[in-house]
From Swiss-Prot:
This is Glutamate 5-kinase. It catalyses: L-glutamate + ATP = L-glutamyl 5-phosphate + ADP. The keyword Amino-acid biosynthesis applies. GO terms for molecular function: ATP binding; glutamate 5-kinase activity; RNA binding. One of its GO terms (biological process) is L-proline biosynthetic process. Its EC number is 2.7.2.11. Keywords: Amino-acid biosynthesis, ATP-binding, Cytoplasm, Kinase, Nucleotide-binding, Proline biosynthesis, Transferase. It comes from Rhizobium etli (strain CIAT 652). HAMAP family: ProB. The keyword Repeat does not apply. Residues 281-358 form the PUA domain. Transmembrane segments: none annotated. ATP binds at residues 16, 175-176.
Amino acid sequence: MTSRKPLARYRRIVIKIGSALLVDRKAGLKKAWLDAMCADIAGLKAKGIDVLVVSSGAIALGRSVLDLPSGALKLEESQAAAAVGQIALARAWSESLSRDEIVAGQILLTLGDTEERRRYLNARATINQLLKIGAVPIINENDTVATSEIRYGDNDRLAARVATMTGADLLILLSDIDGLYTAPPHLDPNATFLETIAEITPDIEAMAGGAASELSRGGMRTKIDAGKIATTSGCAMIIASGKPDSPLSSIENGARSSWFAPSGTPVTARKIWIAGQLQPAGELHVDDGAVTALGAGKSLLPAGVRSVSGLFSRGDTVAIVGPEGREIARGLVSYDAEDARRIAGRKSAEIEAILGYAGRAAMVHRDDMVMSAQLRQKSERQKKDAAHA
């Protein structure tokens, strides 16, 4: 089992913040708490860590602004509250992060943005670009248009999907409880706190309770569901209390929290998903030079593609076939079939002139590709030969 490590040793962290932490039912936004939270985020970024925030609170904040009554809201009421609250929430994050000269970027997702491959790739590219320029993506479900049939249902699971989408190696769920207990502690005074969870078993799932606040849709059950999504994709998860000011600093200073161990690594888990669960929609036939490049761990460029077969869309899975007619790799293609045919055999610098838009340099990026066992073995032999040369 992978051991727990300090936050500073992670590469990319997704932080989910519950509504009850950000919004007081009567007083509205908890500005002082948010400022302290953003100072924590600035501290992580100063250490070179990518930080993404999945922030609940739009409906809760809009509810406060509109002075809606307590209790369950009708769908149209919650969507109206989200429309009002999302503006205020984005402004609050932007203002607090700007205190440390950090730019915030708002992203509102719906279920299809992570479940449909084409939209998934587009959302991931946008998030990665924000991280590349040093911004902090502030992500929330688009509650104004989401319905009960087409929604994540809670931001715990949304945060887990964002973590897997972006290859994060840590997901932190901040809530009004400090971690996982063997039973709901407010119901069972003898409940035992669990500091480390090596694997999410049926017994672990049975320990989850329900939501504790009208401002929040989630509860321990949704956090365990999020843990299953994250850990099986190679991402560790922490459940911790967000009640103290500077909750991330509190975690670093030893505050009690539950740590869920990952299985594998984010890249390994995603490549297993590509190789084993998706059927190729087409084929890219490549030359010997491309085979050598892929064996060295590089992306597939249009120049190495000899021909294209099949009908596919950007984001679909395609098989990469070598000169001998054998599949040597499989991956998510960056272009529709028609455009792929037009740029096959051409240099990446020519793409914009041919297609009329600046597409991606790689036909299949190495992060979206898994090599066949045969090519992996050949690559390993080449590395060993080079080492002994």
